[in-house]
């Protein structure tokens, strides 16, 4: 019996260790309340209109009735965060066990630890500014879709699930199309190349992407609520919950245009965001640099131009992040999603045995064996950063900027 339990612990060591680590972080660091700016999405449902962000409230009301207690919503968020921790851990363990080569296994383990220690680990979703964000459910969906891709063999069932879950996720928040949809595009691109450009596969992949794009466009431009007066909407919502609702998100989402968002939220702070954004990118070079290095190895090792093109197109899926960085001011959320998707892409392609990524992981594993201290320092370095917030920048980024500014002033004698 003891031997059997020991074998199970050894087999599922990654899942167990990652789950315990994440759940422990959730236990000791979770914010005490749902962030005020997002709590309204737990109350709004389809009785108020039709469109994105109304799905979550509708689902909750199926179980709670017409009145939602604040404590109920908070417990729901905690439960979903716990599920996310388990899903990420299971995904990591699946990939680790699939690696048979020792170097690839070591590289996969490094990427898992590297991600869990990074500012974009699931722990960013229970910081004060992100507690209860709809990004939680988008992340859960992205992990589930990755698992479906890895485990479901039937092509038609797989893409039906992609379409249904993708549309459901967009109904939770249409920003999915910019934040996590790139990971789904990478999977469809891999399928197209893997099929040898079979017409049926191309049609299925493109149709899925097109239909999800149509769902997004409808949710973004053709949906809305049945209220023309903000005060009436707030009064009606407040009568159905004990949550102290925040008015600004309702006004911004349903009574502003995209132009209003840009000029009222983004433009006044754009210079500061660009400044701190550049510093964030610079300080987190070890993270994105590691992923980019693997992609470059995959491109270099491509046996022909067609193989190289696949990886270039996969990299270009990241262009989807440009609109949200340009138009919306929650740069912490955008950075977090970007790094999450890079991690998911590596895990999925490693699991399915993509040749280029496999060669990149093998080289990474060999590099880790030659210089383990360097990679340990990388992990310790990224672990020194706090987790991404919503609007605010990483504390270390701001300190770096002001310390550098003070140093410059001291050198110049000002």
Predicted regions and their residues:
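Membrane-lumen/periplasm interface segments of specific transmembrane helices
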Residues: 24-33, 201-291
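Short hydrophobic/aromatic helix or loop-helix immediately within or flanking a transmembrane segment
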Residues: 47-82
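Membrane-interface micro-motifs in multi-pass membrane enzymes
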Residues: 48-54, 106-148, 172, 327-347, ...
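Transmembrane-helix motifs of polytopic, lipid-linked glycan transferases
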Residues: 79-104, 144, 148, 292-293
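Membrane-water interface signatures at transmembrane helix termini and the short loops
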Residues: 123-134, 278-350
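Short hydrophobic alpha-helices at membrane interfaces in multi-pass membrane enzymes
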Residues: 151-167, 197-204
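Perimembrane helix-loop-helix junctions
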Residues: 180-209
